[in-house]
Swiss-Prot record:
Induction: Is repressed by the transcriptional regulator CtsR. Forms part of an operon with ctsR, mcsB and clpC. Residues 139-174 form the UVR domain. Interacts with McsB. Phosphorylated on Arg residues by McsB. It comes from Bacillus subtilis (strain 168). Keywords: Phosphoprotein. Disruption phenotype: Cells lacking this gene show a defect in the delocalization of competence proteins. This is Protein-arginine kinase activator protein. The gene is mcsA. One of its GO terms (molecular function) is zinc ion binding. Activates the phosphorylation activity of the protein-arginine kinase McsB. Is required for the delocalization of competence proteins from the cell poles. GO terms for biological process: proteolysis; stress response to cadmium ion; stress response to copper ion. The modification Phosphoarginine is found at residues 115, 169. The lineage of its organism: Bacteria, Bacillati, Bacillota, Bacilli, Bacillales.
């Protein structure tokens, strides 16, 4: 996508503005964003890069850093990725891994970061197409309720757990009935 201001460089900033109830999308390059920083709400003296974002996440705050000393000490035991040779310290510096094996090698180090960034989720769920995903929505809901049930039992909230268990049973019954209907067709 090309910058809407200069029509020369690739757009790296994408804004959505709502003006008088009308949604307007603006796509501009970094240079035009700096030049027109006031109109886009960007501070001209404060640069932004993905590196700064990831560095900020890796060095979140003092409580995270204190917890991170134990977390990062494990990465020093694993000196480098066996495939590409990248160390976790290098990842912290440049903000990106060298290969897919790095994710496996440094999994225990990046899990807290991912959990913080993705609101507690560390597993990609993806989207389900509406046309063909009817049963998948129900199965996902059952999986979420089962996790909630385990949590409630662990917290000894047995009355709430019984309600969740009943919801799971109802959803499983509806799933069985839709599966049997599809088999008959």
């Amino acid at each position: 996508m090309i910058c809407q201001e200069c029509h020369e460089r690739p757009a790296t900033f994408h804004f959505t503005k709502v003006v008088n109830g009308e949604k307007i999308e603006v796509h501009i390059c970094e240079q035009c964003a700096k030049e027109n920083s006031d109109s886009y709400g960007i501070s001209a003296n404060q640069g932004f890069s993905i590196h700064n974002l990831l560095s900020g996440l890796l060095n979140m705050d003092s409580s995270f850093q204190n917890a991170g000393t134990q977390m990062f000490s494990h990465s020093e035991q694993i000196s480098a990725c066996p495939k590409c040779g990248m160390t976790f310290q290098q990842f912290r510096k440049i903000g990106r891994f060298g290969c897919s094996e790095c994710y496996k090698t440094f999994h225990s180090n990046i899990t807290p970061i991912l959990r913080k960034v993705h609101s507690g989720n560390t597993v990609h769920a993806g989207k389900i197409p509406k046309r063909i995903g009817g049963n998948l929505h129900v199965r996902r809901q059952i999986d979420m309720l089962k996790k909630e049930l385990e949590s409630l039992i662990h917290q000894e909230e047995f009355e709430n757990a019984a309600h969740v268990r009943d919801q799971i049973r109802l959803l499983e019954q509806s799933l069985k009935s839709t599966d049997s209907e599809e088999e008959q067709e």
